[in-house]
Design a protein with these regions (language model features):
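Rossmann-fold dinucleotide-binding core
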Residues: 1-44, 53
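Alpha-helix N-cap/N′ positions at the starts of helices
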Residues: 8, 58-59
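A broad detector of the eukaryotic-type serine/threonine protein kinase catalytic domain
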Residues: 14-17, 60, 64, 111
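A generic structural signal for short
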Residues: 17-18, 51-52, 113-114, 120
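NAD(P)-dependent Rossmann-like dehydrogenase/reductase catalytic/cofactor-binding core
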Residues: 23-28, 34-45, 64, 68-69, ...
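Short alpha-helical
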Residues: 24, 50, 58
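Glycine-rich phosphate/pyrophosphate-binding loop and the adjoining helix
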Residues: 48-55, 70
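Residue-level micro-sites within transmembrane alpha helices that shape
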Residues: 52-53, 61, 95
Length: 148
C-alpha cells in the first residue's frame, strides 16, 4: 500500500499486486483502504514509483530541464502547471515539500544505475542540497518558508 503525503489531504492509495500475492489479500487490502475513505488503484506489476510518482517524475524532470535551459523561471513554470494543468502545486513547490535532498538522491541513484546523462541530477539541485536549502523542512528551497 502506498499512501500520499499529506494523507489527510490526499485520499489515493496505490496497491501493488504482484503474482505471488493471493487475490484474497488484494481484496482485503482494497476493503481496508476503502473503509478508510481512500480511492484505490491497483498495479498489476511492481514498478519503481508506482503510478503517480512515475508520472510525476517525468513532469518534474521536464520542469527542471526548462529551468536549467533558461527557458523560464521556476515560479513561472509552477504557475503554468497550476493554471494550465489544474495541479494544486507546481513541480518546484512540490519538490520543496518533498525535500530537495529526496529528489537529488533519487536522481543520483537512478543515474548511477542507468549511466544515462538524462538521469544525472541538475547542478542547481546539487548546489541547493549542498547549501542545506532542502525546501520546507529547512525554511528554504526554491521558495522561502517561515519556520514555525
Amino acid at each position: 500500500m502506498h499512501f500520499f503525503y499529506p494523507p489527510i489531504r490526499m485520499d489515493l492509495v496505490e496497491i501493488s499486486y504482484p503474482d505471488n500475492v493471493s487475490k484474497n489479500v488484494l481484496e482485503r487490502t482494497k476493503t481496508i483502504s476503502k473503509n478508510m475513505g481512500r480511492s484505490v488503484v491497483v498495479l498489476k506489476k511492481e514498478t519503481p514509483g508506482f503510478i503517480v510518482n512515475r508520472m510525476l517524475a517525468a513532469l518534474v524532470d521536464e520542469a527542471y530541464e526548462l529551468y536549467d535551459e533558461g527557458i523560464a523561471e521556476f515560479e513561472d513554470i509552477d504557475i503554468a502547471i497550476k493554471k494550465g494543468l489544474n495541479h494544486p502545486l507546481g513541480p518546484f513547490e512540490l519538490s520543496d515539500y518533498s525535500g530537495l535532498d529526496i529528489h537529488y538522491y533519487a536522481k543520483l541513484k537512478k543515474f548511477e544505475e542507468s549511466g544515462d546523462l538524462r538521469d544525472k541530477p541538475k547542478t542547481f539541485l546539487k548546489e541547493k542540497v549542498l547549501k542545506g536549502d532542502l525546501g520546507v523542512k529547512t525554511g528554504k528551497g526554491f521558495y522561502k518558508y517561515n519556520k514555525e
